Design a protein with these regions (language model features):
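Amphipathic, charged-and-aliphatic alpha-helical interface segments
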Residues: 1-14, 128-144
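Preference for long, well-ordered alpha-helical segments
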Residues: 147, 164-182
Length: 182
């Protein structure tokens, strides 16, 4: 399943590796719903563009430290609140969520709605999803350190051992570069 996530991620999109990974996952007993959940999870890599740009854009627009409007405050409470996950997230990506909300309430809502999809059905265990996300953030073509640290911590909290982490990183290192999808 980790190999499927890596090969299907936007940083690789390797057609042969995707096919092989699907075949291997199916032979190992993975269901179509589980495979789809993994692909849904890794499709979220695109939000890293938001993470890398929201604060600089908000600073340039001079809205980074503006007070939330009442609507924005309501959205903040609904989606972020006091959830420990988002507190840890803010440690890795300081001010991102607030900057994104100040720039676009619609994007803020869409971020939370889209990123939550693979966490709703529970087809794949959370620990495995964290290992997959961590591996995707560690591929040679991506190297997204804030996400790597966050997902590593989460995987460890969920009981992932050293061997599982090392295997995920090994698979990440072997991920082929994106050569286009024809």
């Amino acid at each position: 399943m980790i190999r499927l996530g890596l090969s299907a991620s936007v940083t690789a999109l390797n057609r042969d590796a995707v096919r092989t990974s699907i075949d291997e996952a199916a032979k190992a007993g993975a269901t179509a719903a589980q495979m789809q959940e993994v692909v849904s999870l890794v499709s979220g890599l695109g939000v890293h563009s938001l993470m890398a740009t929201a604060v600089p854009i908000a600073l340039a627009a001079q809205v980074e430290s503006a007070q939330f409007t009442p609507e924005q405050q309501m959205l903040w409470e609904k989606y972020v609140g006091n959830d420990p996950f988002w507190s840890d997230f803010e440690t890795e990506l300081p001010h991102f969520l607030g900057a994104m909300l100040r720039l676009s309430s619609e994007q803020f809502i869409a971020f939370f709605e889209y990123c939550s999809v693979p966490w709703k059905s529970g087809q794949v265990r959370a620990r495995l999803k964290e290992l997959i996300a961590m591996a995707c953030d560690a591929t040679p073509a991506h190297r997204f350190a804030p996400g790597f640290r966050l997902h590593l911590r989460n995987a460890l909290k969920l009981g992932a051992g050293r061997l599982a982490v090392m295997k995920a990183l090994e698979l990440a290192a072997e991920t082929p570069p994106h050569e286009g999808w024809r």
